[in-house]
């Protein structure tokens, strides 16, 4: 199944899905050190892109025609280990993930996050 990994980081989700038999066709992240690590471990492309740039992200992702979108938007604004301040800006990336998914409309979506994200204002908006 053609899969794209958003907020891919160094590739933990990509690796797990590949080992489960999914075809990762591309990944996206916005943090250069993670992208460098990802590139050392996978042969498919990883794109450096801020997913808050929703229109640009949609244009890129559409070129891959994914059947599955996986991703783990940043959790720091929700996590019990953090400040739980949704006003810091990272929480909005969860909404951006939803906007991207709604525009692409893959057959399947898997989003990973901390449990507290479910209780957040952002989750209610999504």
UniProtKB/Swiss-Prot annotation:
GO biological process, one term: methylation
Known function: A methylase, recognizes the double-stranded sequence 5'-GRCGYC-3', methylates C-? on both strands, and protects the DNA from cleavage by the HgiEI endonuclease.
Residue ranges constituting the SAM-dependent MTase C5-type domain according to the UniProt record: 1-126
Family: Belongs to the class I-like SAM-binding methyltransferase superfamily. C5-methyltransferase family.
Reaction(s) this enzyme catalyzes, per UniProt: a 2'-deoxycytidine in DNA + S-adenosyl-L-methionine = a 5-methyl-2'-deoxycytidine in DNA + S-adenosyl-L-homocysteine + H(+)
A GO MF term: DNA binding
Superkingdom assignment: Bacteria
Organism: Herpetosiphon aurantiacus
Residues of the active site: 75
EC number: 2.1.1.37
Name assigned to this protein: Type II methyltransferase M.HgiGI
PANTHER family: CYTOSINE-SPECIFIC METHYLTRANSFERASE, DNA (CYTOSINE-5)-METHYLTRANSFERASE 1
